[in-house]
Amino acid sequence: MKLTLLAAAAVLLAGPAMAQAPLPDVPILAGATSTPDCGNLAGLAGKAFCVSAPLAAIGALADAYVAELEGRGWLPAGGDTNRVVFVKRREGGGCDGLQMQAFYDTSRPAGPDATGYLGFGTIPGDLCAAGEPGEAAATPQP
C-alpha cells in the first residue's frame, strides 16, 4: 500500500496541467485564501488547488482540512510530515484518492508571517485496485 501511495503522489506532481479550480470536497475554510498559482512553487500551479495562510497557522489549517475531509468520507491512508493521502470508497467499488501537500518558499525566511501553502489534488485511478508491493496475483489451483 505504501508503494501505491507514493506512486499516486508522484502522479499528482508529474501529471498534466489542469485548470485551477476548487475540488468538490475541498472548500475554502476560514483562515485560508485561494491561491491559484500555488505560490509558483513545487510545480503545482495548474495541477493542484491551493490555499495559503500565514506559516504560523498552516499546521492548524491542515488539521482543519483533515477534519473537514474526514467529515466528507475521506480517510487518511498515508503520507509523511508534510503530506496526507486520503482514500474514499466508491459506491460501485474501488477507491478515489486525494492528496494534501503542505509547503512554503524555502528560499525565503520561514518566519511566522511567511506564506504557507496547502495544495490539494486528486490521484487518478483506483487506489484500492493495487495490492501490496511484491504481492503476487492468486493463481487458481487445478
Language-model-detected regions and their locations in the chain:
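Sec-dependent signal peptide recognition
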Residues: 1-8
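N-terminal signal peptide c-region/cleavage motif recognized by signal peptidases
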Residues: 9, 14-16
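An acidic-aromatic pocket/loop used at catalytic or ligand-binding sites
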Residues: 19-142
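Homeobox/homeodomain signature
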Residues: 3, 16-18
